[in-house]
Amino acid sequence: MSDNAAFKFGSFDYICEHAALVVCPMLGDQQGMAPTCYSRNVQLGSQIIFQPATCILHIAALVMATIMLLHVRSKYTAVGRKEIVLFFYMYIWVELFAIFLDSAIIPTANKVYPWFAAIYAGSVGALYWCLLLNGFVGFQFHEDGTPMSLWFLRISSLVVGAVCFGIPVATFKGTSSSMSPTNTVGLFITYLVFPCVCVLIYFISQMLLVVRTLDDRWVIGDLVFMAGFYIAGVLLLVTFSVTICDAVKHYVDGVFFSTLAFLFAVMMVYKYWDSITKEDLEFSVGSKQAVWDVKDPLLATGMEYYEDDAQSAYRGAGGSLVGGYNGNQYYGNQPGYAQSAYGQQGYGQYGAGGGYGQGHY
């Protein structure tokens, strides 16, 4: 890699000079490509941890993604719930891989590193493809949540992931003259260009969806913030990483801030989805207590609701049910009907003897 390399489409020279990407150690000459400035390492026992601040951020991203995933799963009747759930599962998968690769827990010199880096690259491609397809769920080309919708999303994401996995493997291994560590056009397209195209299509599709079908225009702000965070993450990673690294004396670099910006972008995706989907409470089966529970002391068969009745405006004495009796008098605050009002006072002018046998038929 030449010093002060200029940006060139299809080449990682400029990018790997400015940012410590997962694929960079496998590109270029036998020594790989390394950034001119990178964050400090820490040693835990015999293990050296690269990018420690970024690793902590990856863990925080896992926690936030889990929280968002649980919130999405709780909206049982929301449109596109199962599709967006798959997106968050894939994001969690990518973040798990990033922890082991960014930190060099799997050393770059290890013979398994190229395979893990290729799996990571394939997972990133599948993640962005899943986001792109989620952008079309709202147009209802197929009914969301159906086997057709879900299996198309899963199978197509698997196919895209396989392609984005195979190209890095071929590039790292140098299987042909068109794919080698020094000829990286294919990897450049699948690893860098393809994700940007997916985000662009998702943004445009959701803007069209909001403008054409929704009355609420405030959700456009979520989309704008999502796009802004994503663009900021790309620029911080590719353009300003070395500047940041030098300014803070190698404590962090652009990888840290780009990871943070991408996390914010994912949070905006969740915020946007949550804003445009409504929960149908009538058919919701959430983990909360039943929304439509009716705790009516008049229908109680024992002392269970007596306290609620006594604290009401009538102090347990008002509220006519039959013949001027309230719930406590009618049921006698006893289990069952053993002390019914008919048995105690009779019915009308017949008195106690004209009742129904002290509460029994």
UniProtKB/Swiss-Prot annotation:
The gene is CHS7. It holds the Pfam family Chs7. The keyword Endoplasmic reticulum applies. InterPro entries: Chs7. This is Chitin synthase export chaperone. Belongs to the CHS7 family. One of its GO terms (biological process) is protein transport. It comes from Cryptococcus neoformans var. neoformans serotype D (strain B-3501A). GO terms for cellular component: endoplasmic reticulum membrane. Chaperone required for the export of the chitin synthase CHS3 from the endoplasmic reticulum. It comes from the Eukaryota. Keywords: Cell wall biogenesis/degradation, Endoplasmic reticulum, Membrane, Protein transport, Transmembrane, Transmembrane helix, Transport. One of its GO terms (molecular function) is unfolded protein binding. The chain crosses the membrane at residues 48-68, 86-106, 119-139, 150-170, 184-204, 218-238, 250-270. It is found in: Endoplasmic reticulum membrane. The keyword Coiled coil does not apply.
